[in-house]
């Protein structure tokens, strides 16, 4: 399941995460956002606890999207160690997202390929 995060609790939730964090920025009525959420739900089902996936409604939260200068939706941002690292592009399928994460987080892709955690 993908949890909602707000401007108010963003720094606390992302900063305390022991795993990389993906944040989807979305708004109601955005068809691309709904499609991305479905792909992220599939991704969460495969990677388990090796990645935290959150979503933020930009119509209710302005601070974080403004700091990141988000101008189009959906947008997907990667955080590690509580810090913004980069945006993830090519927001089509779960496999495309995993491909972009592969060089950064080898255990994530190993989980998706084998169906069980690496190690």
Model-derived regions: residue spans:
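Structural micro-motif
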Residues: 19, 62, 68-77
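Conserved acidic residues
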Residues: 57-59
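Aromatic-flanked redox-active Cys/Sec active sites in thiol-based oxidoreductases
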Residues: 25-30
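Non-catalytic, surface beta->alpha helical segment in thiol-disulfide oxidoreductase systems
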Residues: 72, 77-112
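A short beta-strand-turn-helix
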Residues: 3-20
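Hydrophobic beta-strand anchors of alpha/beta hydrolase catalytic cores
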Residues: 22-23, 53, 76
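Typically the conserved alpha-helix immediately C-terminal to a functionally engaged Cys/Sec
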Residues: 32-47
